[in-house]
Amino acid sequence: MTQPLITDVETEFGIGRLHRYRASEPMKAVLVLGHGAGGGIDARDLTAIAESFAGSDLEIVLIEQPWVVEGKKVAPAPTRLDACWIPLVHAARGRDLPLIVGGRSAGARVACRTADDVGAIGILALAFPL
């Protein structure tokens, strides 16, 4: 598996973590994905996407929410997830490139709720809970 560049980012509610799978130059867009409430970024669909696009012109960034970095087992309220997600996405985006956000399950919900706030041009929702 390709090894990501890992960066810690301070948020209002603790340190989140970016796992950046570098794209080839010139990069065309950034895809930022979050994990679900019951698991981490090692979910099979998230790792498959990161591996499939590694070295392409699409940079993939998997985000670990602060509660996961802290080792907690239960996700906080959606408002707190959103408050942590927004600065993490801004840090993940870096350059002024088209941004696609998404995630697995609860991560997809966070991405949908905050897509306008972060300036996303699209959303990729995996295992989206109804």
Predicted regions and their residues:
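Primarily recognizes the serine-hydrolase "nucleophile elbow" in alpha/beta-hydrolase
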Residues: 85-130
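Residue-level detector of functional hotspots within protein domains
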Residues: 4, 51, 109
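Serine-hydrolase catalytic machinery in alpha/beta-hydrolase-like enzymes
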Residues: 9-99
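Short, hydrophobic/aromatic-rich segments at coil-to-beta transitions
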Residues: 1-8
